[in-house]
Design a protein with these regions (language model features):
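Flavin (primarily FAD) binding-site architecture
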Residues: 165-186, 204
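Active-site/ligand-binding neighborhood in enzyme catalytic cores
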Residues: 37-141, 148-151, 169, 177-179, ...
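Central beta-strand plus flanking loop segment that forms part of the substrate or channel wall
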Residues: 187-215
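Core beta-strand elements of the Rossmann-like FAD/NAD(P) dinucleotide-binding domain
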Residues: 156-165
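Dinucleotide-binding Rossmann-like beta1-alpha1 core, especially the glycine-rich loop
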Residues: 1-33
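A short alpha-helix-loop-beta-strand transition element characteristic
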Residues: 1, 66-72, 212-218
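Conserved flavin/dinucleotide-binding core of flavoenzymes
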Residues: 8-9, 151-153, 169, 198-200, ...
């Protein structure tokens, strides 16, 4: 609406009742996420119940104030790049579990938002590429993977690349478009087809100087 507002900390200005409910929610999420085995969240006692519930349906059942509901939905969109109705509550709790809790995930000082790379994070793959020299093949989408007792053969744009081992570092949904011989387990195929990427556009804006710091906004 053309107005600029500011706040301190990780939580925006909300009505008192919403803030109190958010505090209770955070404690509940911390308690419930600790019930998930870190390497096997599906083995939790209430995994079936939580996986059958979307984040949105859970919010409607358990969150009363409008401010706390809106904040919980915003968290889902910001962290998972998906709508609350598209993600199970078990997935949400597991995300918190792997990220060491909500405060760490959204926090700046001592949290996930604290650090950045001078010059940009793109330098990580760039430096890795320098070490690999001429062993990188670009613009070659993989069509098929063949596996035998001696290793794997990767087929990409008509070329065959041989290796002892293969690390498949692509989104699960893209992996489902690759032909495997021998075939992947049926449960793995089903999982790949049911794990789409989030839908989001990120924009990075660079300014000549950090004017917001001079105004005491950061």
């Amino acid at each position: 609406q053309g107005k600029v507002s500011s706040y301190h900390g990780d939580i925006p200005k909300l009505p008192l009742l919403s803030l109190l409910e958010l505090g209770l929610l955070e404690r509940r999420w911390q308690r419930e996420m600790r019930n998930l085995p870190q390497d096997a969240p599906w083995a939790a006692a209430r995994a079936g119940e939580w996986d059958a519930e979307s984040i949105e349906s859970w919010i409607l059942k358990h969150v009363r104030t409008a401010g706390a509901r809106d904040f919980a939905r915003t968290l889902t969109r910001a962290m998972l790049c998906a709508e609350p109705r598209q993600v199970s509550y078990l997935c949400f709790l597991n995300y918190l579990r792997q990220g060491r809790g909500l405060n760490t995930l959204i926090g700046t000082e001592g949290g996930a938002q604290q650090d950045k790379f001078v010059g940009g994070a793109w330098q990580i793959p760039g430096r890795m590429a320098e070490r690999l020299a001429g062993d990188i093949v670009l613009d070659a989408p993989v069509l098929a993977v063949e596996q035998d007792d001696d290793g794997v053969t990767v087929i990409a744009r008509g070329e065959r690349h041989r290796a002892r081992h293969l690390i498949m570092a692509v989104p699960p949904l893209l992996a489902s478009r690759i032909h495997f011989n021998a075939a992947l387990p049926s449960k793995r195929n089903a999982l790949n087809e049911r794990m789409p990427m989030g839908s989001v556009i990120k924009i990075h804006i660079a300014y000549e100087r950090p004017f917001w710091r001079q105004r005491g906004l950061n």
